[in-house]
Design a protein with these regions (language model features):
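Boundary-proximal intrinsically disordered activation/regulatory segments immediately upstream
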Residues: 1-64, 71
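Glycine/small-residue-rich loop that forms an oxyanion/phosphate-binding "nest" at active or ligand-binding sites
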Residues: 65-87
Length: 87
């Protein structure tokens, strides 16, 4: 997993735009929060493009996160906790 520590990172900026309706419509993407919700989305046939993981989630749910990373068609990024909290 690649670590993102700067809010200037293009992937992080793109994710932040998804907080607004306009950003979601322009990009035709949504944010899904939580390992359980990501799993439900995948079971429903939604392709996960990017997975963001925080250090606290990684520490608490390492097996679930590892499984999700392996099943994700896109990329997985480890976010610094302050950035993850902003998402």
């Amino acid at each position: 997993m690649i670590e993102i520590v700067s809010s200037a990172n293009p992937k992080f900026k793109l994710a932040m735009k998804l907080h607004e309706r306009r950003g979601r419509q322009q990009q035709q993407k949504i944010l899904i929060d939580g390992t359980r919700e990501v799993r439900y989305a995948m079971q429903s046939g939604i392709e996960i493009e990017t997975l963001f993981v925080s250090n606290s989630v990684l520490a608490e749910q390492i097996e679930h996160v590892t499984e999700l990373v392996n099943l994700t068609a896109g990329s997985a990024f480890y976010l610094a906790q302050d950035l993850f909290d902003r998402l």
